Each structure stands twice: as C-alpha cells, then as structure tokens.
Amino acid sequence: MKKLIYNKVIPFKGFTAINLFGFIFARKEYESRIERDYLRKFVLLNHELIHTAQYKELLYVFYLPLYMLNYAVNIFIYRFNFKKAYKNICFEREAFKYEYSNYYLDRRSKFSWLKFVFKR
C-alpha cells in the first residue's frame, strides 16, 4: 500500500490529503483517525491514486494547470459556490465516483477523466 506523508503544512487546513506529483500528503492531525480505520485509509489512498494515474496521463506537468483551469471555469458555472466547483472538477468527479472500487485502477482506461468534462 502506498505510504502517506503526514505533516502539519501540506495540505492546507480544511483538507485531509493532497496528491502532488504522485506524493500523497495528509494532515498530521488526521493520522490516528486514518491509520486506525482501514476502510477510511483505503478510500483515501484509492482516491489519491486515481489522481496519480491522471497525473501520469498528463505527463505530470499538465495536470495541475488543467485542474486549476477546470476549477476556475466551475467557479463561474456554479456561481461562486467553491465547494460545488471543487466537487465538479472532472478529475475529482472520477476519483469520487470510483474511490470505493477495489479494482478500478486495474481496469481503468487511459484518460477516463475525459468522460467527466462535459457530463454533469
């Protein structure tokens, strides 16, 4: 199982974990809660590993610019409802939809996140 990097800085407060270029960072204050709950850890890691697959498809350098562009567009689509804008980022929609799936990453087609670009 992929290792989480626990710390007090990354991600910002309000977030549990973030994937940056394939490295998964989690807030230190959530460590005991994550580590003692196998399902919570599995879902968290699975979600972030879906993002790693997305990073790889976009050669790592194009992922964050596309992610931020999608978020910026969504902010206007969802009338400055930042949470809804975040939840509807195409990369997040794929990750949220399949985070509980045991075999999704093994069976996932390349660029699967594209299915979520225009589908609302």
PLM features: residue spans?
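Short pre-active-site segment immediately N-terminal to the catalytic Zn-binding motif
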Residues: 14-17, 24-45
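Generic, well-ordered alpha-helical segments
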Residues: 36-37, 41, 57, 61, ...
